[in-house]
Amino acid sequence: MLQKIQRFGGAMFAPAMLFSISGLMVGVSALATTADIVGDLAVYGTPWYVFWTIIQRGSWTVFKRLPLLFAVALPIGLAQKQPARCCLEALVAYFAYCFFLSEIIKLSGDNLGLEYPSSLTSASGITVIDGIKTLDTGIIGPLAVSATVVAIHDRFYDAKVPDWLGTFSGSSLVYLISFFAVFALAAISAAIVPYVYDVTDTLRHALAGVGPFGVGIFVFLERALEPFGLHHLLYMPIYYDNLVINDGIYATWSSLLPILSHSTRPLNELAPWAGFTATGWVKLFGLPAIAAAFYSTAKPERRAGLRVILVP
């Protein structure tokens, strides 16, 4: 079981590997279009401004398409057979899931406490996935769809069918079964997600008000789970989903960077949610504590030699 959970966490990390270059380019382009940093080069309409604005728009690709990335990436690490075909099946199944939810909200949104928007803009609880107005399930929805498709794929991809049904073997059979499976998943999602929103809002306000103590607990849990390969399950919803702030901490930070750079107010007032990204400090200030732990638990006769190693 632990090995399966580790594989799941590793599969989730695949899209995260793309965040570094995307975040770097978002940051660089934001700085390049900030007049306080580059001066008159960043004036609207100049070739410099036009170039970096286009670069910045393209740099948002990963952050603006997170659900699709997670839907496609999960089979890479989890599928036992033909993972490339499983990625295609998962992508199509996720689109079907979004269309199912879109129609459910359109027909029964009033009963669910959701309002179907008249235009292609996000509303409360509603998001737009490649032109599909659907329920906002964050990255949990695509992960659930993708995991379902992976299970169906590994079970039925090599299933034997009569010769006259040969067209429906392989990926066709997997998608046929997945089609009805994600329909059931969409119905369940439509029923429970509005209640999940209430819990998420409560948790979001709680996390926003925990201060340094809460961030310390988060860092401790992340480091405790890291040896088991399970830390992705902890930080993914906080960094990349809507648990702490809409659109996730990293995407919001990148979009607000020009505003933050102009402000003279303390960062903990402007963006208190950004404290959850300060996990790197534990590596710096945790070293003296680690050294003290080594020294205090060493045998008395060996402490002098250990001190020579630890202090430098």
Placement of each model-derived feature along the sequence:
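Hydrophobic faces of alpha-helical transmembrane segments in multi-pass integral membrane proteins
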Residues: 17, 21-24, 63, 67-71, ...
